[in-house]
Amino acid sequence: MKPKVRFFDLQPYGDKFVVRDPVGISQPFIATPELLFLLSLMDGTRDITDLQAEFFKKTGHLIPKEEINQVINFLDENYLLYNERFLNKLKEEREKILKKGYREPSHAGQAYPENPQELKNFIEETVNKNSEKFKARGILVPHMDLRVASGVYGSVYSAIKENEYDTVVLLGVSHYFHETPFSVLPLDLRTPLGDLKVDIERVEELQKMFDYDLSHDVLAYKNEHSIEFQTIFLKYLFPEVKVIPAIVSYGDTKSLKEIAHKITKVLEDSQNPLIISSVDFSHVGRKFGDPHSYDPSPRDREYINLLAELKNEEAFNLLQSDNNRTRIDGQFTNFVFLEILKNLGVKEGKLLDYDVYHEAPTDSKVSYAGMVFY
């Protein structure tokens, strides 16, 4: 047997690490650096004898084969090995979600109130801003913690709450395992205020334009807050609207333009579509691999100015030019977002609000903004 560990996420935890499953099938566990090194050797090319020898060669410590076998069994039991057992479980979980017919809210009662009346009060307080109103065709909103970023959420949704929309294209990012470049969730979105209906006719029409299954990455939506956080505002402000929930995961400018063109195509008979990009901006500091935090606003402003002018290629190239050094979120999502808006005749965008959250214990910062496009 030559075990192959599948992809997982790591988060520092003192002198150890929390190992998290980006697919959401397995429970997190604590791992030492030594264990992580052993896991890194499990790439499908080594059997137990090879693993023992390579670990000894690099560390000078001889692990008994029985212990290595225990680790392999633990990984297998928790579907953390890339093998037939994991693939069957993945298929089973996908089918389970699709069969259910709707996406359960995973953050209700934690990030926002689960009680309907309390949630209504929370949203009403958030969107009760006397801000300038816009007949916006597109909005860029954070997916930052609702309690932290309520002011920015409020700036945007207050600006459009008097509008009417018949279809919403909700573009998020994936914080979890996502194989395909682009996916669509063909399910209603349950909220404490009722179900936000999926625009299933347009979703099915969109699927016909792609040569891969757009629901293949349905598991990525299970805990995805970039989708969920917008649903509560949409259900409250536009209760009858239908939604196309989607994630843009990766792509080059050519393929991203093709995605945008296809989305635009299914909106041809929509009288009042709204396009949403649910993204945050820079992620800097020790939590994200920097030696310390720093002010990301100069870089953010440069990027925001390009977004406001709908210069998606320039904005994309700016981030690509230095490997997105401040880790601005949603570069692929924003490219598709702006391309759709240009296809719909939108001419300009405006920054309504911008802020930076500083997490003192980890000396890390996350920036976020609210914009309207019209």
Swiss-Prot record:
Family matches, as Pfam families: Memo (PF01875)
InterPro entries: MEMO1_fam
Positions of disulphide bridges: none
Stored PANTHER family: PROTEIN MEMO1
Family, per entry: Belongs to the MEMO1 family.
Protein name: MEMO1 family protein aq_1336
Taxonomy of the source species: Bacteria, Pseudomonadati, Aquificota, Aquificia, Aquificales
